[in-house]
Amino acid sequence: MSGKLTVITGPMYSGKTTELLSFVEIYKLGKKKVAVFKPKIDSRYHSTMIVSHSGNGVEAHVIERPEEMRKYIEEDTRGVFIDEVQFFSPGLFEVVKDLLDRGIDVFCAGLDLTHKQNPFETTALLLSLADTVIKKKAVCHRCGEYNATLTLKVAGGEEEIDVGGQEKYIAVCRDCYNTLKKRV
């Protein structure tokens, strides 16, 4: 039986990692073998753990290239969990397809759009393959409504790939994005 792909996406501070960690916990409670991965580029909260903004976490294999995942996935692995997929190369798409064909469920979490509202290529590819998409929202940093679907960069230049947290990025709704973008 083929595996299923679940992609959890949305802006920063929307609970993507928290949701990913809840699926890890479900698989562990079901005594299913899991493999958890994060990109080496993201060491914001911990170098060897996936950690949510709220502080919850789980140990993860830290890799640079998607192909490295294969050496950590054993015959009896039932679930693969990948955080911050936007930081991986598009080669992740082929690795995930292979895992699904092997009957392994895959859960991915990551940003769908850059702070300039351009799609992250790897996330977009995974969304095209997904069996289930969980689109998260956040509380808008400006108006306080639970309608933020965008991430606005407020410090640190214009680079689209620039790892950071609250010192660089805020979650905003489209109206507030357009208002604030005129000022930034």
UniProtKB/Swiss-Prot annotation:
Q: Which residues form the active site?
A: E84
What GO CC terms are in its UniProt record?
cytosol
Q: Where in the cell is it found?
A: Cytoplasm
Give one Pfam hit by family name.
Answer: TK
Keywords carried by this UniProt record = ATP-binding, Cytoplasm, DNA synthesis, Kinase, Metal-binding, Nucleotide-binding, Transferase, Zinc
**InterPro entries, per the entry:** P-loop_NTPase, Thymidine_kinase, Thymidine_kinase_CS
Catalysed reactions listed for this entry: thymidine + ATP = dTMP + ADP + H(+)
EC supergroup of this enzyme? transferase
Q: Which Gene3D superfamilies match?
A: 3.30.60.20, P-loop containing nucleotide triphosphate hydrolases
- By its UniProt entry, which PROSITE patterns does this protein fall under? TK_CELLULAR_TYPE
Binding-site residues, ATP: G10, P11, M12, Y13, S14, G15, K16, T17, D83, E84, V85, Q86
| Subunit-structure text | Homotetramer.
Stored HAMAP family: Thymidine_kinase
- Which PANTHER family does UniProt cross-reference here? THYMIDINE KINASE, THYMIDINE KINASE, CYTOSOLIC
Annotated family: Belongs to the thymidine kinase family.
Q: What is this protein called?
A: Thymidine kinase
Native species: Thermotoga sp. (strain RQ2)
